[in-house]
């Protein structure tokens, strides 16, 4: 009986997570544009409230990016580790 694991799928999933993390920058910039368009709500684009909101938004996006990217790396590493272990065990049984 042969069991076939799709380690490439695990690697691709990790790569997709990392790519999605990278695409967050475009979303971040779109939100900043909307915030600046509605900056009167905070007292104008140059106001401390508006700039503070933009700064905090940037920090939040940075944390999300870092966590998603790190998770993608861990998924890829886990897939690679499983593939190496499977290969080592398989060759020892040959």
UniProtKB/Swiss-Prot annotation:
InterPro entries: ESAT-6-like_Myco (IPR009416), ESAT-6-like_sf (IPR036689), T7SS_ESAT-6-like (IPR010310). Keywords: Secreted. It is found in: Secreted. Pfam families: WXG100. GO terms for cellular component: extracellular region. Belongs to the WXG100 family. ESAT-6 subfamily. This is ESAT-6-like protein EsxI. It comes from Mycobacterium bovis (strain ATCC BAA-935 / AF2122/97). The lineage of its organism: Bacteria, Bacillati, Actinomycetota, Actinomycetes, Mycobacteriales. The gene is esxI.
